[in-house]
């Protein structure tokens, strides 16, 4: 790959992710749910066999979804479709690319296939989404070719606190870099185990070079507005919609709250009459070995 081709491919992949800014990406497990999400205004859907709450509850090894399920969802909607591959499982990613998905999420929600290496995302034409809990992790995924970063949160809990923590961590570390001189940036790059050129770029621009969404525990319109006000560029919602009492209404309300995140009166209005939110789990009650956000390095 020539430098010109590399630059153009990177620009295209990141541009596709940029088109989703300000939107909501929803987990769906059937074509019918995908159509509900599209009708509610979702900017994209994530096709998978089990939402994170069910993966957490049922345990076992969580793998890439059945190709028939993914193709059924791709054929059901006109908005972009994402699908998950296990960390390090480049063959699952190859399969997903062959199925024509629009984005691949190398996801800690599934059981890792490789505890040393993430997928080399430069080997694919399809853009990748990856999770991160801090700036170093985000920059390592970008170095591997990720076109979008999502702060991980703790998927399948309905507890937004970890999403808030990870977003604050990433943004706080970016702000810290901005106050450093060049010598300090070299040290910071070593500390966070990220390439110096990327660290310097982040320090100069005050943001990641790719789109930053938030995931993990967003369950209400207020949750979505919270992370948007904190600087997220969009929201992933997993179990919070289709594990709630009125999925269609909640999906539409979260989309509206994500768009009107700085209008409390509008958020209050869309929060009315949504029925019961998902019951969820307090992250503090989840033992460390069972926390999905700990997967990845």
From Swiss-Prot:
SUPFAM superfamilies assigned: Ribulose-phoshate binding barrel (SSF51366)
Pfam families: SOR_SNZ
Sites where the protein binds D-glyceraldehyde 3-phosphate: 168
Keyword field contains RNA-binding: no
Keyword Transcription part of the UniProt annotation: no
Record's catalysed reaction(s): aldehydo-D-ribose 5-phosphate + D-glyceraldehyde 3-phosphate + L-glutamine = pyridoxal 5'-phosphate + L-glutamate + phosphate + 3 H2O + H(+)
GO BP terms: amino acid metabolic process; pyridoxal phosphate biosynthetic process; pyridoxine biosynthetic process
Active site: 84
Residues that hold D-ribose 5-phosphate according to the record: 27, 156, 217, 238-239
EC number(s) given by UniProt: 4.3.3.6
Subunit annotation: In the presence of PdxT, forms a dodecamer of heterodimers.
Function noted in UniProt: Catalyzes the formation of pyridoxal 5'-phosphate from ribose 5-phosphate (RBP), glyceraldehyde 3-phosphate (G3P) and ammonia. The ammonia is provided by the PdxT subunit. Can also use ribulose 5-phosphate and dihydroxyacetone phosphate as substrates, resulting from enzyme-catalyzed isomerization of RBP and G3P, respectively.
Name of the molecule in the record: Pyridoxal 5'-phosphate synthase subunit PdxS
Organism in which the protein naturally occurs: Corynebacterium diphtheriae (strain ATCC 700971 / NCTC 13129 / Biotype gravis)
Name of encoding gene: pdxS
């Amino acid at each position: 790959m020539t430098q010109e081709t590399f630059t153009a491919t990177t620009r295209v992949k990141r541009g596709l992710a940029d088109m989703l800014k300000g939107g909501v990406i929803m987990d769906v497990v059937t074509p019918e749910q995908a159509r509900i999400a599209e009708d509610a205004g979702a900017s994209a859907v994530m096709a998978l066999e089990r939402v994170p709450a069910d993966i957490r509850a049922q345990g076992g090894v969580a793998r890439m979804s059945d190709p028939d399920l993914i193709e059924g969802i791709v054929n059901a909607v006109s908005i972009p479709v994402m699908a998950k591959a296990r960390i390090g499982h480049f063959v699952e990613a190859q399969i997903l690319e062959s199925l024509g998905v629009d984005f691949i999420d190398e996801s800690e929600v599934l059981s890792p296939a490789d505890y040393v290496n993430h997928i080399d995302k430069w080997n694919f034409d399809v853009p990748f989404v990856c999770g991160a809990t801090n700036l170093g992790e985000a920059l390592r995924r970008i170095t591997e070719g990720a076109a979008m970063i999502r702060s991980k949160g703790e998927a399948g809990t309905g507890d937004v606190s970890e999403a808030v923590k990870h977003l604050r961590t990433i943004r706080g570390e970016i702000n810290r870099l901005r106050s450093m001189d060049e010598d300090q940036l070299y040290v910071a790059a070593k500390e966070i185990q990220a390439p110096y050129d990327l660290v310097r770029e982040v320090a100069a621009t005050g943001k990641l070079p790719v789109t930053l969404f938030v995931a993990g525990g967003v369950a209400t319109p207020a949750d979505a507005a919270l992370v948007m006000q904190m600087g997220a560029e969009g929201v992933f919602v997993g179990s919070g919609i289709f594990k709630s009492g009125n999925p269609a209404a909640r999906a539409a309300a979260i989309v509206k709250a994500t768009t009107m995140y700085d209008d409390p009166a509008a958020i209050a209005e869309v929060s009315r009459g949504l029925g019961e939110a998902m019951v969820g789990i307090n992250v503090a009650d989840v033992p460390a070995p069972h926390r999905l956000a700990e997967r990845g390095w």
